[in-house]
């Protein structure tokens, strides 16, 4: 319920045009079916594997609403140009990240995540990162994505080619 309230507040009366599915783990997709029902024209952007998983998770695939994104595909939304970055097996097999070329933001899925929150802050530079976050970032990496070392290295190589002003992980 809180998610929907936050979303409607952010939309400020506008409709939702796109849902970008970075990966299909239930903590990321619990509201997907409800959002598709509430916004009948919304387009779902995801990998081919995520499209298959949507059908497996929800019992049907919204074929008319899904746009499969591959490495390097882009979407111009008007003000923003989004570039999709494949990140398979950085935690789950269907993972992708989104790079906003306009604002230089990398929505990094579970890569670069952290356990915990920033104590009410939105940005890491508003806290003492070394004191308050570093241990939880290490613990997150070790427990969630560390076992996929070669895949994480591949994502780091891709990220190094982007002009990133801010990382926006899905956790932490």
Predicted regions and their residues:
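Short, glycine/acidic-rich beta->alpha junctions
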Residues: 24-27, 88-90
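Pre-active-site segment of Zn-dependent metallo-hydrolases
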Residues: 1-19, 26, 38, 42
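Phosphate- and divalent-cation-binding pockets in alpha/beta enzyme and binding domains
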Residues: 2, 30-31, 52-56
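Active-site neighborhood of phospho(di)ester-bond hydrolases with catalytic His/Asp-centered motifs
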Residues: 16-24, 44-47, 106-109, 166-171
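Short acidic, glycine/serine/threonine-rich loops at helix termini
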Residues: 34, 56-59, 117-121
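Metallo-beta-lactamase
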Residues: 45-170
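Metal-dependent catalytic neighborhoods of phosphoester/phosphodiester hydrolases
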Residues: 30-38
